[in-house]
A protein has these predicted regions:
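N-terminal auxiliary segments of SAM/dcSAM-dependent transferases
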Residues: 1-41
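Charged, low-complexity surface patches
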Residues: 5, 62, 111
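A broadly tuned "polar low-complexity/structure-edge" signature
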Residues: 12-21, 47-52, 63, 100, ...
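Feature targets compositionally biased, intrinsically disordered low-complexity regions
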Residues: 32-38, 62-64, 102
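Conserved alpha-helix/loop element of class I SAM-dependent methyltransferases that forms part
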Residues: 40-80, 90-98
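Class I SAM-dependent methyltransferase SAM/SAH-binding core
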Residues: 59, 77-126
Length: 126
């Protein structure tokens, strides 16, 4: 019998796998995205524009993040960056542009579907 923690992990994996497998048009936006899920509260302040950043890949932008973590991380050329919960790779691709050839970016995600999506997106960028 599964305990509550395992049940919750399964729910999270299932939901994010569904999102990874949806088309961009079908994708439901998270609370931090442009439409929000949490009533009348406007969360669009978190929905910063990635599309002006070097390394941005629109196919990797599933609207699941909050803000632009790469702007606050003080990433420099040659750094090693680890992105936990990397999803389809959006922040990883932006970070890769910042660290350059001398750096390294590692994306880690909980779901195999998101990892596969990130790999597909990475192939499009090479």
């Amino acid at each position: 019998m599964k305990d509550r923690n395992d049940e919750l992990k399964d729910i999270v994996k299932e939901k994010y796998s569904e999102i990874a497998n949806q088309s961009k048009q079908q994708n439901e936006i998270s609370c931090c995205g442009s439409t929000g899920c949490c009533g009348d509260v406007d969360y669009t302040i978190f929905s910063e524009k990635y599309d002006t950043l070097k390394g941005y890949n629109p196919d990797a932008d599933l609207g699941l993040g909050c803000g632009l973590p790469t702007e606050f991380a003080q990433i420099k050329a040659g750094d090693t960056v680890i992105d936990l919960g990397s999803g389809a790779g959006n922040d990883c691709f932006v970070a890769r542009a910042l660290v350059g050839d001398a750096g390294k970016v590692i994306g880690i995600d909980f779901t195999e579907a998101m990892i596969n999506k990130a790999r597909e997106n990475a192939k499009k960028m090479n």
